[in-house]
Structure formats: C-alpha cells, structure tokens
C-alpha cells in the first residue's frame, strides 16, 4: 500500500476532569506524537468563533455574556446544574470539534496520533478511534487538582464529575 493512503493509528486519550490527561498528553508530545486537544478546540470556538458564540447566545440568552465575551463561570454553572443545557452545548460544540479533528487528522504524517478528550464517549467519537487510553486518578486527587488549577469550589468540581461518564462505563465498552 502506498504511504500516501496509510492512516495513522488513532488513539483516544480520555478520563474525567483532573485525572491527568494533559500530563499524559505532554509525554506523548515529548515523543513527537501529535496531540489534538478537544477541550482546547472547544474553548477556542467559544472565544473566537463568532458563529459558535451566536449559537450559544441563542441557546442560553444574552445574560451569558460579559463584556462581549462568554462568561465562562456563569456558563459552567448553568450547564453543570441542568442536564438539558449540558446536552444543548454539547450538541453545538461536538460536531464542530469533530470537523476540526477530521481536518487536523488529514494533515498528520505520523504513525500515531492522540485525540485527547474528556468526552470521547459522550461525543460519540470513540468508535472512530483505533485504541482508547483511560487516565484515572482517585476522586479526591482529581478534586484537589481542579480546585488548584481552575480556582473552583469543591461543590463545582463534584458537579462536573457527576455529569461525566463514569470510568466503569468506559471500561465496560
């Protein structure tokens, strides 16, 4: 088979918030393996993509804005206390991130690539990958990491964790 038509091995890297996905990604990057960070691309869409921002305003209202930008603490509070709102934002973002990943993948020339995403299964993209790596950490450790990293309260972090797929469900897939 010609080198041009060979697809890289697509590896999904997942785990709950604060599990250590970014640390593992850095190891892969240090080995020269390209990493697509889904969370970074989602945030970029919410900060820079006017079309996405308009969709968010339409779904969540003008009150979600602060100084012409999305008020992320307010958005987080809304989506992690209302499962319907969480589904709404995922319905907006997941297809856009999937398209960005597809475009990025076409440009890769390595034998392996990593797609880092806390929501591989929720976004229905896990089945498009060849292998999955699940990064795990004790819940208490995860909570402490996120409190320090994101300046969130324990209650906020627990709400996020409770809205993510359980590790047991990933292992049983």
Please tell me what each predicted stretch does.
Residues 16, 28:
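P-loop (Walker A) phosphate-binding loop of NTP-binding proteins
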Residues 11-13:
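Hydrophobic anchor at the beta1->P-loop junction of P-loop NTPases
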Residues 22:
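Walker A/P-loop
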Residues 40-109:
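ATP-dependent small-molecule kinase phosphotransfer cores
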Residues 1-9:
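Extreme N-terminal, non-catalytic leader segments
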Residues 100-101, 109, 127-128, 139, ...:
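Small-molecule kinase domains that catalyze NTP-dependent phosphoryl transfer to phosphate-bearing small molecules
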Residues 99-107, 112-145:
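ATP-dependent NMP and nucleoside kinases share a basic, alpha-helical "lid"
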Residues 19:
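ATP-binding Walker
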